[in-house]
Amino acid sequence: MQVDKVINNNLIRSHDEKGQEVLVMGCGIGFKKKPGEYIDDGKVEKVYVLQKEERQHMEELFSSMPLECIQATNEIVEYATISLGKQLSNYLYLNLCDHIHFAIQRSKGGIPIQNALLTEIKRFYNHEYQIGMESLNIIKRKTGVLLPEDEAGFIAMHLVNASMDFQDLAPRQELMKL
């Protein structure tokens, strides 16, 4: 792949072998790179295939995010996809990365947000909640910030919303009644 545009030191816009527009992420992948130069495959950590309508938003979000938040998000989404055994929406990367970034900022600023639905989330979406709890460990390892348990519930709901398998709506409908 060749560089189309350097977004920052860790993010490049390019095209894959199918001609699809992609964002390529990796530590230092964009450092001193210019359009037309080849991307070092050894530095590629993640490739995001872009839909036309999401390109600008993803570029803006990822260019302003610390690399640790992006890496934590990648690891969480990979773990969740395997654990849930289903495909998750690409928008999960955007939404979850943004959420994690602001949760870390709130935590550092001493601004807690209580998850009023935490008990219900544990009950109706226990698997997603357990993934959320593991996500807190991933975030701690990648960023050095331990987020409160309430955030595991918020992450669980991001996973539920990103699920591509909408066959079992009963738990969601039950939660909505509450």
What are these regions (language model features)?
Residues 1-178:
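A cross-family "folded-core" feature that marks the main globular domain of proteins
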